[in-house]
Amino acid sequence: ESFELTAQTETKDGNKKWLSFRVMVSMDVISSQLKPVSYITITDVTEKVEKNRRYAREREYLRDCAARDSMTRLLNRGTMEDRIKEELESVAEGQNYAYIAIDLDNFKQVNDVYGHWVGDRVIMSVSNILREVYGNQVSIGRMGGDEFAVFLPDVKDRMWIQGQADEVLYRLRRQKEMIGMAEEPTASIGIAFGPEDGTSFRELYHRADAALYQVKKEEKNSIAIYTMI
């Protein structure tokens, strides 16, 4: 019978080492009697443990890269969709939630007039603003190009959600000088509230997008809620 234990120890000079302790128990004849005898083997496995940890970190990094937009480090479209589907499955009865679609106004014109490096600055500004306004505890994604989304799984106050969306637009307009544009960068926002506007990702996405389209058609640089259009 045997068992093995790996533990970290500290040497006299302060270095950390990982040691594997393997204990084997066998029955041997001692003084004409059959008695259990333990044999302990100690092996330095520091290199092996550190290599496994390094591989684990690399695998985690690769998984994270596959889940995120390479420029902004926000969730990419596929991951965002999967996250929202998971969160919708755990929604309690009577719980309200919101899907917020954000789309930059005249973004092609920004790229054409100022160049793609300024367009990239605008994209990064939006991603940073979304993190600042909504925090790191909710799902925020870049759905592609100049399209972003936020999913709020537990909405208590819809006016507060509108206020946050207004704050996003306000902060974006203030980025003009930092980005290097002659006019204020703006965006349009469409909001779908669940469960009445939808109970699936597809329903919420399309209804927030319909509200967004209404803003784009009428005035831009504003917010529309699906149930009110």
How does the language model describe each region?
Residues T43-R57:
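PAS-associated C-terminal cap
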Residues L5-K16, M24:
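PAS-family sensory domains
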Residues D44-T46, L104-D105, V155, I229:
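PAS/PAC or PAS-like capping segment
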Residues T41, I100:
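Sensory beta-strand/linker motifs that couple input domains to effectors
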Residues F21-S38:
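Short loop/turn elements at sensory-signaling interfaces that couple input to output
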Residues L34-S38, T79, N96, N221:
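Short beta-strand edge/capping elements of PAS-family sensory modules
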Residues R63, A67, N76-A98, D105-G135, ...:
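Conserved long alpha-helical elements within nucleotide-processing catalytic cores of c-di-GMP signaling
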Residues I140, E167, M181-A182, S188-E196, ...:
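Cyclic nucleotide signaling catalytic output domains
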